[in-house]
């Protein structure tokens, strides 16, 4: 995602500036799979389930969470001799999602909206918006930022807005529910 866009994720679908983004064909999400028997090596290859995706107890029937493409999930679900059920895993709220200093109620599948800063663009700063941009302003753009008596100060001056010096990018992996990406560490500076 590029600077100046607003990102939102709804039910695992990425929206940029309010428009749904086409999912990559190989995007994986986690599915809860109730196995009746172990998945054969041949079927694992067909659904592209790697050895590292397999839990240790894979050699016996039971309920497991696997990263699968929608096509692989359909194929596994259609094999009633192997899988009793295949359902998309609904991730709970994560406290460690960006911004970590704000309780948003967001999940990896339902996130945002968040504006991705662009060089020369200005954002209005309030105590509500500050958690989204504080790290960028302080760490990446080397400013002294503080809050005193409910007011925001940048480099000793009271600030109600901030103009970014750099472009920022939003990184997301194809294995959406198993990716350490910008949902966890925020926008990435151009440098």
Where are these regions (language model features)?
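Extended hydrophobic leader/signal-anchor segments used for secretion and membrane insertion
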Residues: 2-191
């Amino acid at each position: 995602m590029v600077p100046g866009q607003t990102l939102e994720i709804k039910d695992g679908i990425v929206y940029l500036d309010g428009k749904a983004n086409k999912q990559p064909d190989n995007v994986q999400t986690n599915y809860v799979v109730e196995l009746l028997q172990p998945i054969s090596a041949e079927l694992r290859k067909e659904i592209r389930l790697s050895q590292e995706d397999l839990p240790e107890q894979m050699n016996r029937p039971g309920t497991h969470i696997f990263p699968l493409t929608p096509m692989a999930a359909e194929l596994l679900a259609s094999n009633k001799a192997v899988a009793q059920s295949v359902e998309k895993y609904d991730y709970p709220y994560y406290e460690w999602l960006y911004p970590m200093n704000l309780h948003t109620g967001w999940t990896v599948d339902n996130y945002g909206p968040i504006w991705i800063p662009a060089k020369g663009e200005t954002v209005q700063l309030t105590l509500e918006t500050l958690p989204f941009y504080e790290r960028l302003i302080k760490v990446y753009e080397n400013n002294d930022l503080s809050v005193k008596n409910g007011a925001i100060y940048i480099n000793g001056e009271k600030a109600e807005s901030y103009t970014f010096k750099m472009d920022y990018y939003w990184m997301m992996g194809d294995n959406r529910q198993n990716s350490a990406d910008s949902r966890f560490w925020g926008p990435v500076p151009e440098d």
